[in-house]
């Protein structure tokens, strides 16, 4: 007996020691873990990741950027039945416990100790899940579980139950990049929370357990099983719903499918520009902070721009041959519609052109085609009229081709993806706001933004910049310059003999007519007369970098490599009275709380603001680096008929706090150039633009060697717009694909919408000009040039040959 008591004493002592050690170990672990726990107060100001939203100037959605989908909601916005579905699924006693389900924890510990399972159910309340989601990782261990318990207790002590549930519903992952209940409801069902049905609520409540492998899109069978056998039945057991309600919900088939927020304004190139600018401004996290970015893009004008570019490129293709089917697939003779449609998987729509596969053709010349959604379309014979070949001879079963909607409802036309590309840039000439931008035919096919990244030769559309330099030097629209052959030779003996596009020469002509008819030799002679160095320096006033402009006479023919956006910016100087504006795209930025954190204040052109009249190239009547083109004309200028000393046109001044754009060129030169470019439309290479029936349309066509590039840049009303058409591989667009043929129709179609209801822009001669008659034409000239008109009037010596060699150095 004594020995037994001794053993019991030793056993008791050991137990006491082990208990003390356990208590000390637990205390040490508690202290070690609790001392490292994060501050729970951060949950009160937590910033959940949200995507970045991009809007047009008129408030229409352009794009959503970000790695996740999330739309945080307040708990009061969550329907009661939806809350009950989550409580029944995750934590039925949520509003009763203090954050810990001790019975569940005991069960989890027992299973971990007695089984080989590393992951066991039970023990995690909604509060614990919030602790894990915000502060811990997903590792299964005693240490993490203890930290989770301690954090849950702290959370319960500082947050209300509804605040905890709100965090849980907004933080939980629902698969397919959807975080939070609102994003899940929109993605899977395209609904707001208050629009959900009971079966949809139950389906959503069942997702967080298996968000990737058990969501209703990835695995609808598994999702339905969890909805019917667990979520709905638990709601019945807890008296949240009746059995009849559950049965009715169970009878509804799974119907979830992807729903993306509808983009209201298709402007992918502009949206991508915003994305890049936001990252540059705020770093990569900008895409996850819930910023709301308002741009300068006008929704109506952007739609018109996209449509115009697509129509213009389609017409370009119609002028050239049918290249054949995009691809041909050998299909079984008995293949049904679904089988045919399956062959279109992975072939995306581009530029409004949809892929279809030919099912059959008819002797009457029509064709039945199948779309990727398994719908059938019947193409009438007229759908391929532009090809000159009946559909039954053009297509065969298994051909994959493109179609796009016609002008009438239900009408479709046969198309082919264009071999050319096009870009359109439209600015508010007075402040540089980008109102429309199309960077190419299809952003889906190629994200290269030709409006801002493509450097192409502008051809004759560059001539107005050279002409403005000549007018600054003392030339005037009536000055005579010969359109005649000339050869330039450098010091190494290399020669350059510029030619007109038509290979002909018209002899002495007024420079107004030379610009209207786009005579290359006159442009070259003008540049040679004023000097390349002067012209390069002067043209930088339009916003170009001097190193972008060739340091030789070829500059006059538009051989610089420039972006369409930079050309539009340069033309804005003509459109706004001579001020250099900066193109801009982001207008406002609001944070997730809709607080304004950025507002753009662009520099504005102001013709009535004298403070802006700075940085003007000074006028002089002396020629620099010129050549003797012959004796001056005997024609004397007539007596001036009018001196314009009247006050300038009254233009409302902007807010005095508005920054003013710097003056780039003399407003008198602007007046002369605008008048000349309006003549380009009235009687020159852009007469098609007369169809707009406006007196303020001005611009210039442009083409390059072998028709590699086609341009039209011009302005009217408040807008300046540049259109470019060309091929990315720099191949020719084809015979006679000039700017007036390939680019101008796009410009006209767009401007018809842009200028609707816009007032006519006036071109009033400013102060310091005199109207006089010279060489049979009445022109406005600068007052200081009146006594030097003959200095800039040349004609060829009759005894000189048609070609004359000059040393350009």
Swiss-Prot record:
Any single biological process term in GO: cell wall organization
Pathway: Cell wall biogenesis; peptidoglycan biosynthesis
Region called Disordered, residue ranges: 624-661
Bilayer disposition of the protein: Single-pass type II membrane protein
EC number(s) reported in the record: 2.4.99.28, 3.4.16.4
Region (Transglycosylase), start-end ranges: 52-221
One annotated Gene Ontology cellular component of this protein: plasma membrane
Listed GO MF terms: penicillin binding; peptidoglycan glycosyltransferase activity; serine-type D-Ala-D-Ala carboxypeptidase activity
Mitochondrion recorded as keyword: no
Bilayer-spanning residue ranges: 6-26
Record carries keyword Transmembrane: yes
Pfam family, one: PCB_OB
Major location category of this protein: membrane
Gene3D superfamilies: Biosynthetic peptidoglycan transglycosylase-like, DD-peptidase/beta-lactamase superfamily
UniProt keyword annotations, A-Z: Antibiotic resistance, Carboxypeptidase, Cell inner membrane, Cell membrane, Cell shape, Cell wall biogenesis/degradation, Glycosyltransferase, Hydrolase, Membrane, Multifunctional enzyme, Peptidoglycan synthesis, Protease, Signal-anchor, Transferase, Transmembrane, Transmembrane helix
Periplasmic side, ranges: 27-809
Cytoplasmic-side positions: 1-5
Start-end of Pro residues biased regions: 649-659
Compartment list: Cell inner membrane
Catalytic activity: [GlcNAc-(1->4)-Mur2Ac(oyl-L-Ala-gamma-D-Glu-L-Lys-D-Ala-D-Ala)](n)-di-trans,octa-cis-undecaprenyl diphosphate + beta-D-GlcNAc-(1->4)-Mur2Ac(oyl-L-Ala-gamma-D-Glu-L-Lys-D-Ala-D-Ala)-di-trans,octa-cis-undecaprenyl diphosphate = [GlcNAc-(1->4)-Mur2Ac(oyl-L-Ala-gamma-D-Glu-L-Lys-D-Ala-D-Ala)](n+1)-di-trans,octa-cis-undecaprenyl diphosphate + di-trans,octa-cis-undecaprenyl diphosphate + H(+); Preferential cleavage: (Ac)2-L-Lys-D-Ala-|-D-Ala. Also transpeptidation of peptidyl-alanyl moieties that are N-acyl substituents of D-alanine
Active site: 90 (proton donor), 460 (acyl-ester intermediate)
Region Transpeptidase, residue ranges: 411-749
UniProt record similarity statement: In the N-terminal section; belongs to the glycosyltransferase 51 family.
Chain's role: Cell wall formation. Synthesis of cross-linked peptidoglycan from the lipid intermediates. The enzyme has a penicillin-insensitive transglycosylase N-terminal domain (formation of linear glycan strands) and a penicillin-sensitive transpeptidase C-terminal domain (cross-linking of the peptide subunits).
Protein known as: Penicillin-binding protein 1A
Species name: Xylella fastidiosa (strain 9a5c)
Primary gene name: mrcA
């Amino acid at each position: 007996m004594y020995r037994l008591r001794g053993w019991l004493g030793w056993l008791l002592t050991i137990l006491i020691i082990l208990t003390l050690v356990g208590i000390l170990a637990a205390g040490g672990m508690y202290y070690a873990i609790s001392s490292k726990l994060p501050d729970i107060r951060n949950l009160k100001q937590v910033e959940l990741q949200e995507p970045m939203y991009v809007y047009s100037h008129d408030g229409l959605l352009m794009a959503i950027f970000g790695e996740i989908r999330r739309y945080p909601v307040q708990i009061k916005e969550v329907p009661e039945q939806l809350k009950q579905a989550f409580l029944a699924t995750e934590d039925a006693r949520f509003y009763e416990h203090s954050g810990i389900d001790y019975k569940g924890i005991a069960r989890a510990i027992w299973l971990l100790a007695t089984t080989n399972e590393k992951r066991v159910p039970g023990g995690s309340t909604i509060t614990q899940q919030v602790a894990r989601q915000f502060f811990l990782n997903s590792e299964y261990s005693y240490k993490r579980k203890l930290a989770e318990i301690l954090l849950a207790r702290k959370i319960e002590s500082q947050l209300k139950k509804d605040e905890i549930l709100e965090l849980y519903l907004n933080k939980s992952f629902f698969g397919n990049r959807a975080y939070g209940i609102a994003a899940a409801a929109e993605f899977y069902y395209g609904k707001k929370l208050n629009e959900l049905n009971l079966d949809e609520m139950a389906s959503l409540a069942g997702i967080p357990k298996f968000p990737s492998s058990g969501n209703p899109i990835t695995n609808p069978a598994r999702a339905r099983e969890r909805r019917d056998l667990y979520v709905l039945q638990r709601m019945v057991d807890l008296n949240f719903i009746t059995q009849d309600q559950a049965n009715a919900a169970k009878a509804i088939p799974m119907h979830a499918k992807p729903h993306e927020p509808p983009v209201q304004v298709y402007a992918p190139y502009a949206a991508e520009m915003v994305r890049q600018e936001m990252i540059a401004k705020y770093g990569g996290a900008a895409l996850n902070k819930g910023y709301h970015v308002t741009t300068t893009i006008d929704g109506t004008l952007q739609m018109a721009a996209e449509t115009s570019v697509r129509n213009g490129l389609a017409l370009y293709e119609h002028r050239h041959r049918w290249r054949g089917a995009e691809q041909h697939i050998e299909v079984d003779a008995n293949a049904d519609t679904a089988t045919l449609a399956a062959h279109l998987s992975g072939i995306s729509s581009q530029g409004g052109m949809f892929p279809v596969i030919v099912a059959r053709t008819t002797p009457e010349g029509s064709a039945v085609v199948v779309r990727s959604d398994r719908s059938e379309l019947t193409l009438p014979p007229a759908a391929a009229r532009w090809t000159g070949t009946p559909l039954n001879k053009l297509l065969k079963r298994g051909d994959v081709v493109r179609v796009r909607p016609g002008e009438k409802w239900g009408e479709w036309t046969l198309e082919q993806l264009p071999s050319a590309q096009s870009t359109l840039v439209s600015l508010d000439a007075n402040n540089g706001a980008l109102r429309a931008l199309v960077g190419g035919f299809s952003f889906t096919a190629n994200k290269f933004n030709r409006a801002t990244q493509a450097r192409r030769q502008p051809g004759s559309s560059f001539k107005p910049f050279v002409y403005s330099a000549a007018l600054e030097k003392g030339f005037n629209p009536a000055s005579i310059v010969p359109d005649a052959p000339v050869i330039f030779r450098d010091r190494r003996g290399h020669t350059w003999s510029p030619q007109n596009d038509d290979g002909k020469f018209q002899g002495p002509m007024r420079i107004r007519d030379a610009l209207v008819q786009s005579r290359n030799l006159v442009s070259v002679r003008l540049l040679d007369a004023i000097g390349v160095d002067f012209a390069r320096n002067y043209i930088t006033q339009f916003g170009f970098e001097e190193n972008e402009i060739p340091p030789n006479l070829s500059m006059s023919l538009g051989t610089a490599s420039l972006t369409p956006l930079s050309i539009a910016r340069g033309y804005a100087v003509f459109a706004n009275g001579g001020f250099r504006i900066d193109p801009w795209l982001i207008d406002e930025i609001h944070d997730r709380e809709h607080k304004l954190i950025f507002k753009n204040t662009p520099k504005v052109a102001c013709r009535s603001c004298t403070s802006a009249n700075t940085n003007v190239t000074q006028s002089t009547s002396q020629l620099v680096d010129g050549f003797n083109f012959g004796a001056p004309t005997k024609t004397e200028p007539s007596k001036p008929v009018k001196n314009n000393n009247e006050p300038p046109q009254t233009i409302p001044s902007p807010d005095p706090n508005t920054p003013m754009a710097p003056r780039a060129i003399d407003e008198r030169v602007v007046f002369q150039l605008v008048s000349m470019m309006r003549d380009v439309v009235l009687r020159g290479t852009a007469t098609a633009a007369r169809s707009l029936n406006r007196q303020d349309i001005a611009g210039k066509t442009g083409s390059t060697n072998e028709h590699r590039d086609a341009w039209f840049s011009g302005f009217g009303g408040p807008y300046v717009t540049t259109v470019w058409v060309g091929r990315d591989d720099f191949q020719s667009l084809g015979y006679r694909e000039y700017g007036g043929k390939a680019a101008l129709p796009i410009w006209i179609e767009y401007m018809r919408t842009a200028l609707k209801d816009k007032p006519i822009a006036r071109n009033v001669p400013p102060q310091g000009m005199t109207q006089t008659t010279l060489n049979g034409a009445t022109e406005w000239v600068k007052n200081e040039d009146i006594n030097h008109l003959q200095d800039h009037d040349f004609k060829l010596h009759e005894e000189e040959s048609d070609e004359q060699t000059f040393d350009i150095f």
